Structures are given as C-alpha cells and as structure tokens.
Amino acid sequence: MKPQKSLRARAMDILSRQELSRIGLKRKLAPHAESEEELENVLNEFAERNWQSDLRYAEAYIRSKSRKHGSLRLKQALAQQGIDEETSRNLLPDRSSEKLAAIAVLRKKFKHPAADLKEKQKQARFLAYRGFDADTVQTALKHAWDENWEDGC
C-alpha cells in the first residue's frame, strides 16, 4: 500500500500540472484534508509564495479560451472560479479582438452566409451561446463574409 501524500504534496502535484484558482485548488484538495484549518493553511502558504495565483490562472484561462468564447462567457466562468470582476474586466480582450474572434468562430462553424432569417437566427444563437454580446453578434453576422472588411471594428 502506498503511503498517504501530505496535503502540501498533493497541492504541489496538482499545480505542477495546471494553473488553478484558489477555489479550484480548494475543491481538489478538500476530500484529502483532515480539517478546514489545514486546508486554509496550505492554500495561504501557496498564495503567499506565489505558487498559486488567481491572476495567473485568469490570464492563462483567458489566453486559452478567448479565441472561441466571448467576454460574457469568460467573465461568468472566471466568476465561478472566484476571480473578482475587476480582474476579469482588466484581462478580457478588447472589443475589436472579440469581434474578430466572433467572425473566426462563425466562419469555422458555418461555411457560408445565412440564406434566410431562420439560418441567420441559428448563427446568432450559436454566437450568443459562445458568450458574445449582441453588438458583437450583429457585427459578426454582418461582416463575416465581407472580403474587404478586416479590422473595421
């Protein structure tokens, strides 16, 4: 039988594989903690030593997801992980980048412009589900297949 890992060693193993928010790390460690106090001590130590950073997690998350998802969805996902709204707002991509991402996502999913209203609504729902706001959705639907429109955000 393997010896039990300490909570600190488990946290180190988890963070060596992926960036996590404090809440995410707490969720993973909670079943292995003997007490809430022990868990909080480990989380505080890791935060003080900058081994776990909510800011670093938010940056990595946004960098990996911003090409496929809009600001609304990114903000919601970060809020679920305990990242405060101000940090999220500061890290989110600017409007022009988001519009270009929406166009890229739309072109990848739908190979041609909407032929009728039903198809246009389907495309709009797809972008809204991905977390793009109404203005971005309208811009993407209008300009996704324009050859001349590059960065006219």
From Swiss-Prot:
Disulfide bond entries: none
Biological processes annotated in GO: regulation of DNA repair
Main function: Modulates RecA activity.
The UniProt record lists the keyword Cell wall biogenesis/degradation: no
UniProt entry keywords in alphabetical sequence: Cytoplasm
One term under GO cellular component: cytoplasm
UniProt protein name: Regulatory protein RecX
Keyword Cytoplasm attached: yes
Pfam family, one: RecX_HTH2
Family the UniProt entry places it in: Belongs to the RecX family.
Localisation: Cytoplasm
Domain of life: Bacteria
